[in-house]
Curated annotation (Swiss-Prot):
One of its GO terms (cellular component) is membrane. The chain crosses the membrane at residues 26-46, 55-75, 101-121. It comes from Dictyostelium discoideum (Social amoeba). It is a multi-pass membrane protein. The lineage of its organism: Eukaryota, Amoebozoa, Evosea, Eumycetozoa, Dictyostelia. Keywords: Membrane, Transmembrane, Transmembrane helix. It is found in: Membrane. Its main location: membrane. This is Uncharacterized transmembrane protein DDB_G0295689.
Length: 134
């Protein structure tokens, strides 16, 4: 449920990009939201079933999503909105900086925490001793 809530900023930017008809941006936000939901499910399944490989994939994808988010922030800062109004990310220039950076920082923190927790859970599973703990 938390993963669905954390995709909220993607859907907001998805709608804004669709309103401005910047289809590359629509694709970027749609793909990121769907990937986040899919791999959040992988992380949940991996932790429930104690699957080392699913937790590793979950962590790697979170790291990739973190890097992709950082790259997106860099790209939106490099966009020259005044000279190129047809740019794919020009709709972000009309928004306030706080309204863009606050959700992005939240999403980057979620990706970082997901990667760290996935790696910690995988480490615990790998070094788990067999035994009856009940």
């Amino acid at each position: 449920m938390g993963a669905i809530g954390f995709t909220g900023p993607f859907w907001i930017y998805f709608k804004r990009a669709a309103d401005k008809k910047t289809f590359r941006s629509v694709a970027v936000f749609l793909v990121r939201a769907v990937i986040l939901l899919i791999f959040a499910a992988f992380g949940n399944i991996g932790s429930i079933k104690k699957s080392k490989i699913l937790l590793l994939k979950f962590s790697i994808i979170n790291i990739i999503m973190l890097l992709f988010g950082i790259a997106q922030i860099i790209v939106t800062n490099v966009v020259d909105c005044e000279n190129d109004p047809d740019n794919s990310f020009s709709f972000l220039c009309s928004n306030s900086e706080g309204a863009y950076y606050a959700p992005m920082i939240l999403l980057l923190a979620v990706n970082l925490c997901g990667a760290v927790f996935g790696l910690i859970l995988r480490y615990v599973i790998v070094h788990d001793t067999k035994g009856n703990y009940y």
